Amino acid sequence: MPLRLIFMGTPDFAVPTLRELHAQGHEIAAVYTRAAKPAGRGMKLQITPVEKAARELGLPVLTPSTLRTPEAEAEFRAHNADAAVVVAYGMILPANILNAVPRGCFNLHASLLPRWRGAAPIQRAIMTGDAESGVMVMKMDVGLDTGDVAMTDRLQITDAMTAQDLHDALAPRGARLMAQAMVALEQGSLNLKPQGEEGVTYAAKIGKAEAKIDWARPAHDVLRHIHGLSPFPGAWFEVAIDGAPVRIKVLRCELVKGSGAPGALLDDRLTIACGEGAIRLLDVQRAGKQPMRALDFLRGTPLIPPLSVM
């Protein structure tokens, strides 16, 4: 029989899993997500992608500010769920909540644990130059992404992949994997294995100070830095346009042959020298503007050597 589940998630990454579990016939007793926040130019309240999807599916939505009160625990238990599924919820679950459902809480994590425990596994995998990533279903405990692993799906990372590309590849894979895990849980065949502590790394939240491009680094490192921060927060540089510094985010680039002083513009196609080698910018975003192809940017803002970016 299908399970009665509590779903807990917030961003786009979690939506495919919610939809897949619903499509597979599981009874979603409640959807927990973060409260609406002001966003955009008008600072209007914006509900989360998970809340939007839940309402489209006709599912009840809860947005508690904390799970650490007796009232929150009582409400959680009152759903009489078999298990909870957690995907990028954005709030730490205390032990009493983890123990409030008889079959446990299961998390979908976007890394090959124990590598990249923490908040930004997709970005860190690309920024560090990992050859592969993946998604894992684990049974949650009180540690930070330390629970026993139930299922894994691996994916190769290419130089052309941005964080958005990897996110978009892993989200549907994760949805299918969690659905498989819930079938196994229902049938009593879910096999849990401890992670172990060998190879543990932590994916710290991305800080704004990390976003500035360091052109003195080798081209391959610059490419990984750019792609790992694309689209958010976006790796950036500044260039003087009409005598004033203008910040430009780089959303996609490629490795090319070339050499020069780090930050030097090498041609009229936005090829920029790095500490070793060079990169060519493919997609950029000027401050306050929409993302665009680099060649379209150049039509409105020609940049011609000799010129250096900062």
Curated annotation (Swiss-Prot):
Molecular functions per Gene Ontology: methionyl-tRNA formyltransferase activity
Short name of one Pfam family: Formyl_trans_C
Domain of life: Bacteria
Catalytic activity: L-methionyl-tRNA(fMet) + (6R)-10-formyltetrahydrofolate = N-formyl-L-methionyl-tRNA(fMet) + (6S)-5,6,7,8-tetrahydrofolate + H(+)
UniProt keyword list: Protein biosynthesis, Transferase
Any one Gene Ontology cellular component term annotated for this protein: cytosol
Residue numbers binding (6S)-5,6,7,8-tetrahydrofolate: S111, L112, L113, P114
Residues that span the membrane, as ranges: none
HAMAP family, A to Z: Formyl_trans
Function summary: Attaches a formyl group to the free amino group of methionyl-tRNA(fMet). The formyl group appears to play a dual role in the initiator identity of N-formylmethionyl-tRNA by promoting its recognition by IF2 and preventing the misappropriation of this tRNA by the elongation apparatus.
Record family assignment: Belongs to the Fmt family.
Name of the featured protein: Methionyl-tRNA formyltransferase
Taxonomic source organism: Afipia carboxidovorans (strain ATCC 49405 / DSM 1227 / KCTC 32145 / OM5)
